[in-house]
From Swiss-Prot:
Keywords: Copper, Disulfide bond, LTQ, Metal-binding, Oxidoreductase, Secreted, Sulfation, TPQ. Interacts with MFAP4. Interacts (via propeptide) with EFEMP2; this interaction is strong and facilitates formation of ternary complexes with ELN during elastic fiber assembly; this interaction limits interaction of EFEMP2 with FBLN5. There is a cross-link at K152-Y187 (Lysine tyrosylquinone (Lys-Tyr)). This is Protein-lysine 6-oxidase. The modification 2',4',5'-topaquinone is found at Y187. It comes from Sus scrofa. The record marks D50, P51 as: Cleavage.
């Protein structure tokens, strides 16, 4: 996979494997450790979720089942949402939060599933290349027991943005999914399934636990920075997040 190969250019993603002539490394120049070097090619990715991004934009929202049809198809709701007596005008209470994951490793993070098995989601009109990119759980603050039915979030992996000096190479398409070193995959809180269904949760103090690559399906150089834990105070109408930190468990 040569990033300078012009035949890899894609109209679906003009940034894929594309470098402007002015930004392309000059022959004979000193390369930093990165793409195209032995250090990079034999390295490993390292995913790190952003705790401050989650803390800044966590909130509670009520939505009708009518507006949650796509999410219901992707099993993003608690089991009580699938009872036979649930109607379109019934509401669910959702704890929404964003997620931004950086690959700070030295190699691409590539989907665990081969391309031919990526799953097409007709509601959202894109392919999901991983069934378990993230786990979302809500735990009791004192007992650490799970109080809400968190779900396994499948993702469409792409380079949403990159640090200065790095370039986007992957997009949410049928053939270019992944996360490059120095780049971020970002999901805002208003996207479907960026939530935990807390309809059946009582007001109280909880822990929001967000894990990336939770089943270690993709090898990484460091698994100890894959979890964010946040303190959540839920009043029954509002949620307040604080103390979000990277956690080893």
């Amino acid at each position: 996979d040569d990033p300078y190969n012009p035949y890899k250019y894609s109209d679906d993603n003009p940034y894929y494997n594309y470098y402007x002539x002015x930004e392309r490394p000059r022959p004979g120049s000193r390369y930093r450790p990165g793409y195209g070097t032995g250090y990079f090619q034999y390295g490993l990715p390292d995913l790190v979720p952003d705790p401050y991004y989650i803390q800044a934009s966590t909130y509670v929202q009520k939505m009708s089942m009518y507006n949650l049809r796509c999410a219901a198809e992707e099993n993003c709701l608690a089991s009580t949402a699938y009872r036979a007596d649930v109607r379109d005008y019934d509401h669910r209470v959702l704890l929404r939060f964003p997620q931004r994951v950086k690959n700070q490793g030295t190699s691409d993070f590539l989907p665990s599933r081969p391309r031919y098995s990526w799953e097409w989601h007709s509601c959202h009109q894109h392919y999901h290349s991983m069934d378990e990119f993230s786990h979302y759980d809500l735990l009791d603050a004192s007992t650490q027991r799970r109080v809400a039915e968190g779900h396994k979030a499948s993702f469409c992996l792409e380079d949403t943005s990159c640090d200065y000096g790095y370039h986007r190479r992957f997009a949410c398409t049928a053939h270019t999914q992944g996360l490059s070193p120095g780049c971020y995959d970002t999901y805002n809180a208003d996207i479907d399934c960026q939530w935990i269904d807390i309809t059946d949760v009582k007001p109280g103090n909880y822990i929001l636990k967000v894990s990336v690559n939770p089943s270690y399906l993709v090898p990484e150089s460091d698994y100890s920075n894959n979890v964010v834990r946040c303190e959540i105070r839920y009043t029954g109408h509002h949620a307040y997040a604080s103390g979000c930190t990277i956690s080893p468990y």
